């Protein structure tokens, strides 16, 4: 039996069981309704107690906007009012039919940030976003509400706050901003401000949640599905870009507390705006940090060395110079050393042995030529291996490389004429 049923009054519980007939899907719907009610109750408990009378009187009212859709901390239509509290200080009061449901008192000290934000893809709607703190310095869920521009224009005209023939919603925004200033706080309008740094927003995902990332002059906001994230620009220590594709990329914000927040599936067309924002706010871009670059650099170095070794081996196959050194000069020098070593090792110095060597060379000239060529190839391999600094090469088949590895045994028996004890 679902846990929420145990928290219902007995009579309500019996009715739910009777209607659902223990059907899991129907019980699931009832559970969602129950949880929704709990969230609203929790939000009301978190709401700041008002300093106004139980019912709002006209004498306490400074400004009121009716039938505004609230999305946070509660979801319902309420009236937004600026009033004078019992302590004589202005307060924001959210009420239904003049009955307060929540309020933010002492606006000058409570409101930390407020701004009008565009509603993506719906030009007829506008967000009002308010971040505030309580007297105990707690940070409740921010206030988020939407305004229908046409509905607000009509209310302002009916109250005579703007000319009847006006269709400029900006006049309504200006009026509300002035009222806020008079009562101790400011409402920013960053997307209409042509003097300061430009504000912009991008669509993205955080995990499975789709939302909007707002880049404001001094804040970054992700919303508006709970939890709503608000960052002050000076709280962000660094930023990284990752998962970059032809169409999208990811952004990770790292705070000074080393908390990481990744936002994915951002359109590539927004990269220039985000990068400019990062530079303007002097945020560190750690996308090319050493720890991220280390592996690609090592891999590229290894690939480069292997390519050089393969090229040297190809040159050996084609009997071409390796590393810019002529093969002929190396062969002559090597041959000279080889002959001198042969003479020193021969203790008799008799002409008969030299004659026998010449006879052997005359009778089998082709064998001697092949042996000398094998010696050259052997020494060239040693040079290439030394230049590569003991780099491990892929295995090559001797027959494929055209190299006889057992060179010295053939030289000792046929080419040198040297006898060993």
From Swiss-Prot:
GO terms for biological process: DNA replication-dependent chromatin assembly; heterochromatin formation; negative regulation of transcription by RNA polymerase II; transcription elongation by RNA polymerase II. Residues 370-379 have a biased composition (Basic and acidic residues). Residues 286-379 are annotated as: Disordered. One of its GO terms (molecular function) is double-stranded DNA binding. GO terms for cellular component: chromosome; nucleus. It is found in: Nucleus; Chromosome. Residues 328-344, 352-368 have a biased composition (Acidic residues). Keywords: Chaperone, Chromosome, DNA-binding, Nucleus, Transcription, Transcription regulation. It comes from the Eukaryota. The keyword Nucleus applies. It holds the Pfam family Rttp106-like_middle. The keyword Nucleus applies. Interacts with histones H3 and H4. Histones H3 and H4 chaperone involved in the nucleosome formation and heterochromatin silencing. Required for the deposition of H3K56ac-carrying H3-H4 complex onto newly-replicated DNA. Plays a role in the transcriptional regulation of the cell-cycle dependent histone genes by creating a repressive structure at the core histone gene promoter. Belongs to the RTT106 family. This is Histone chaperone RTT106.
